[in-house]
Amino acid sequence: MSQTPSSLCDLEHHSAFVERHIGPNDAEIAQMLEVVGHASLDALTDAIVPGNIKSPAPLALPEAITEEEALVKIRAIADKNTVYRNFIGQGYYGTHTPKVILRNILENPAWYTAYTPYQAEISQGRMEALINFQTLCADLTGMQIANASLLDEATAAAEAMTLAKRSAKSRSDIFFVHDAVHPQTLELLRTRAEPLDIMLRVGTPEEALQAECFGVLLQYPDSFGHIGDHAALADAVHAQGGLVAVATDLLALTLIAAPGQWGADIVVGNSQRFGVPFGFGGPHAAFMACRDAYKRSMPGRLIGVSIDAAGNPAYRLTLQTREQHIRREKATSNICTAQVLLAVMASMYAVYHGPDGLTRIARRTHRLAAILAAALRGAGVTVGEHFFDTLHVKAIDADAIHARARAAGINLRAIDSEAVGISLDETTTRADVVALAQLFGAMADVDALDAATADALPQGLLRSSAFLTHPVFNTHHSEHELLRYMRSLADKDLAMDRTMIPLGSCTMKLNATAEMIPVTWPEFGAIHPLAPAEQSAGYAQLIDELEAMLVECTGYDAVSLQPNSGAQGEYAGLLAIRAYHRSRGEAHRDICLIPESAHGTNPASAQMCGMTVVVTKCDANGNVDVDDIRAKAEKYSDRLAALMITYPSTHGVFEEDVVAICEAVHAHGGQVYTDGANMNALVGVAKPGKWGSDVSHLNLHKTFCIPHGGGGPGVGPCAVKSHLAPFLPRAGLHAGEGQTAAIHGGGFNSGSGSGHSSRIGGMVSAAAYGSASILPISWMYVTMMGSAGLRKATQVALLNANYIAKRLAPHYKTLYTGRNGLVAHECILDVRPLEKTSGIGAEDIAKRLIDFGFHAPTLSFPVAGTLMVEPTESESQHELDRFIDAMIQIREEIRAIEDGRLDREDNPLKHAPHTATQVSASEWTHAYPRELAAFPLPSLKQQKYWPPVARVDNVYGDKNVMCACIPVDAYKIPVDAYKEDAEA
């Protein structure tokens, strides 16, 4: 050990987290640099990144601090938020998160570090949880099918509008909106409708009877608590060839008639009150349920039931051809990331409580609301007659009531000068009812009122149908049972707590525990998104500081944190471009150039903005074809709105001509949109806002360490240059703005952050700051890494990708390389030649990797028949070598097929993955040994992941669509009988 004295500064080791986040240590980095042929990280960076885009100076951010120091700083920020008792409602309600779910789902990396379940065989656990969610939503709404989550209720309502437009027989362009929908829903509908030339008409349900429209949106119960009977309206809309969409409350539906019973075609809502905190607006799992006839037009992911190679039931993503990554500009939606982790929490909440427990919670909530209403009426206060949990209190001095409430630490909903709203929930107590009554000068003897007060639900709309009858909702009601059920599901899956997930273009990096800790603090979780601004001063500081960090990292001038996914960030950026052109009298600019290699969300988002997509070519080296871009920019010069590019490219290279590309587009009046999906190769090295790009979205769930959660949540900030800043999404309604302001399009606040007051763009998320409660994760990451740490992380991401490419070069060709034969942060392995010589394709390799305990790389994107590998900076040399060894062994197995030592059909790749049941069966029918199937490398005998199912049959799953909980008997009957049952 060295005896050299160390300074106190050295011993304080402020950069300790940097060494925890970055996988390889300095000695390993030196070894890996030797393999790739460069002397230092700076030399490697210079060899990869074009000189004309490199940043001349370090990031102007503070240097790194320790985890403990960062937690102290963010605790001080959190303490500036003030937690009041919230009765605001408006789509957000208090709830108790069962501690067993908090600890074993939300705080469990087996759940929050998983990726979207594209690889079905290693995703069976979370897909079972999601199919429980789908069953929950379909059962309560009375619909036939539900999806696996959407971003928020307002977004879901907008998706319902476009689904109705696609599917209705009516050719009308009018969509009728109930004037008692939640205000944030109406605002987002306005954003979505205008670029698509959809006319919104807002009014009462009675007025809807006179409208010739392709669809209506009703709120049930409505935003003020009223429960209306809309059956006649539904019949009238159907008679005109329109569809009926309903925004609803899942808890209320345990007591009132399901929308499907009285004529709804599409039902949307938010599952937030099923165990997920306010979180200043998110993240929460919304949902869409609909009639079976519309399933192929639904947005978002659908979990379906198929069978595996052994004939056993198995889950998979079904009907993927609807989605943006396949249909691109023809997709039903740009939805990509949704809210899987929150959907899992909501589903487990339903599993834990079961139908009886949910009904009890609903009845208790309603009972307290009825008692409060009776107390208020006894004091001469006017309240609504029929309601579930929300009272519309009228004919009062609202300002005086709010003043008393604030003095008592209570928030009520502001409606207008003579009315307030009071929404009760699972957390409401008897003492709360007494305190609320006192605000109005009323006395509440809860027991006496309980004995004397009838329920306030309309008798003609009481629920009569059963729900959640499947055993999964009627079994796991003790904590032990739920704990073991959740553990059994987690054990079926591969997440980053077990292995690297080398998905190209997905950036599956470390989600550090210290980053996650503040998410569960009540100072962040218990703030209602419409609470008065003075109660969210901590959030204001957090948002300002995080926006400033992102501005510095990107070189742009302004950032909006409202988009709650990358796709929504894209949409916000393109809307800003569209609004900018219109502000200059150039509304005719509607052409969006998009390279053929682009992410599928790019063209899907462009068409949602009313743009016409023109695809540009890529050259033989994987670069965007600059000449083709120039030619098409000139051809469409008068109409050119934007070019969308990804940088580094989706082909894993830094293109040399990005500056020239930006100049060419600007010369013809267009704007440049740089997709920030690959920002992990740029932070601290280059800034898109400085090389000519006008706007980017970022993925905080990639580059800035928010976990993927199995398919969400995410945050997709939109960053822009100053000329586009006014057109970023506005922050939403004041806490004190009522329904009238929303209906007439007024009443927008200045938001928490600097410069937000001048923003006039349409809202793209229900809440002003989207998924605000997970923003502390990215703040913590940047704060703990510091300027130098962020740059080093980028450099090691480049090193790790090139190390893999170099070591695998004798075995697999890297399809595209950039300058000096190097890749960016990911590499595409071309396995197409192997299919010609052995019959083994990319999917076979992906499935065989499961036998080695690995999640597959990105399959057949952006080039069919290839594998795209992105290791990120967080994987150690040991883990990289483990993956490389697996890929080399797979190449040896392919060589054995080529040489005739393994059969072309009966080989371990064609039959991968292998389950424990298969390899331990008394009969083994394959021509290769069991040991090769199960333990292709000796190290696997020490630690082995066993997939729960064999290879899943995708074709069968799409032909036999079943998206609800599997009947228990399906696990017992022969496969042929199961097929017949599914087909029936």
UniProtKB/Swiss-Prot annotation:
NCBIfam families listed in its UniProt record: gcvP (TIGR00461), PRK04366.1 (NF003346)
Disulfide bonds: none
Organism: Xanthomonas oryzae pv. oryzae (strain MAFF 311018)
Family classification: Belongs to the GcvP family.
Protein name: Glycine dehydrogenase (decarboxylating)
HAMAP family: GcvP
Alphabetized UniProt keyword annotations: Oxidoreductase, Pyridoxal phosphate
Catalysed reactions listed for this entry: N(6)-[(R)-lipoyl]-L-lysyl-[glycine-cleavage complex H protein] + glycine + H(+) = N(6)-[(R)-S(8)-aminomethyldihydrolipoyl]-L-lysyl-[glycine-cleavage complex H protein] + CO2
Keyword Oxidoreductase attached: yes
TM segment ranges: none
Listed EC numbers: 1.4.4.2
Assembly: The glycine cleavage system is composed of four proteins: P, T, L and H.
Gene Ontology CC annotations of this record: cytosol; glycine cleavage complex
N6-(pyridoxal phosphate)lysine PTM positions: 702
GO biological process terms held by the UniProt record: glycine decarboxylation via glycine cleavage system
One Pfam family per UniProt: GcvP2_C
Role noted for this protein: The glycine cleavage system catalyzes the degradation of glycine. The P protein binds the alpha-amino group of glycine through its pyridoxal phosphate cofactor; CO(2) is released and the remaining methylamine moiety is then transferred to the lipoamide cofactor of the H protein.
Cofactors (names): pyridoxal 5'-phosphate
Matches recorded under PANTHER family: GLYCINE DEHYDROGENASE (DECARBOXYLATING), MITOCHONDRIAL (PTHR11773:SF1), GLYCINE DEHYDROGENASE, DECARBOXYLATING (PTHR11773)
Molecular-function GO term, any one: glycine dehydrogenase (decarboxylating) activity
